[in-house]
């Protein structure tokens, strides 16, 4: 396959599936199996940087608010308002989520060789069930004020989201709603907690960058990143709209359809 077409497909799939609750890693594995398209480490780094840039741009005002309140807290030059305290709690929550996500992610990384194609399809079904359950407006716990417990549960779920076929955004939003957070807040927690995880992952992969074979030139790499960025902006807006309008069951239907089609083809 021509490299230009390959990077366009990879950029499209990464941009769309990183934010929609359909598992980007699961879809990239499907590309590898059926279209013989693999994801070199250097390209993986560029694509993930492009998608995290989408989150930063989309939540730029919210991120600026959090940065300013953190600086205000460090300098202690003025009294903290109730809103400031709420923002500080969100920062603490994201830090706790990141810590437990890293622990689970490291554990899962050690066993990634055991992930079979059938397991990925099973995980697609698990994700579809979680998305369907979100539409029931479940609220089993009311622990949203317990920052540590909330960070623990969401962090574990986000770590599990590293498994191919499990949607990171889907499982973290499910966990947040389970804890009693609103849909809007759950979405915010899910996407903001993605930022430190992606940057941490890019940092760990940086050394591997110089050990990998460069099969794409700089133009092709940048082209793929641009496509990932453009479609990422589209998909994050679409996901926000569909979550607010209780339309996530569409993604459940999509994932079940993908699994059925794959079983038919295989």
Curated annotation (Swiss-Prot):
- In which compartments does the protein localize? Cell inner membrane
Q: Give GO cellular component annotations, separated by semicolons.
A: plasma membrane
Reaction equation(s) it catalyzes: di-trans,octa-cis-undecaprenyl diphosphate + H2O = di-trans,octa-cis-undecaprenyl phosphate + phosphate + H(+)
Ranges that cross the membrane: 4-24, 39-59, 88-108, 114-134, 147-167, 186-206, 214-234, 246-266
What's its top-level EC category? hydrolase
Cell wall biogenesis/degradation as a keyword? yes
Enumerate the GO terms in the molecular function aspect: undecaprenyl-diphosphatase activity
Q: Does the keyword Hydrolase apply?
A: yes
Which superkingdom is the protein from? Bacteria
Spell out the Pfam families in the cross-references. BacA (PF02673)
**EC?**
3.6.1.27
Name the family the entry cites: Belongs to the UppP family.
Question: What functional role does this protein have?
Answer: Catalyzes the dephosphorylation of undecaprenyl diphosphate (UPP). Confers resistance to bacitracin.
Other remarks in the entry: Bacitracin is thought to be involved in the inhibition of peptidoglycan synthesis by sequestering undecaprenyl diphosphate, thereby reducing the pool of lipid carrier available.
This chain's protein is named Undecaprenyl-diphosphatase
Traced from the root, the source organism's taxonomic lineage reads: Bacteria, Pseudomonadati, Spirochaetota, Spirochaetia, Spirochaetales
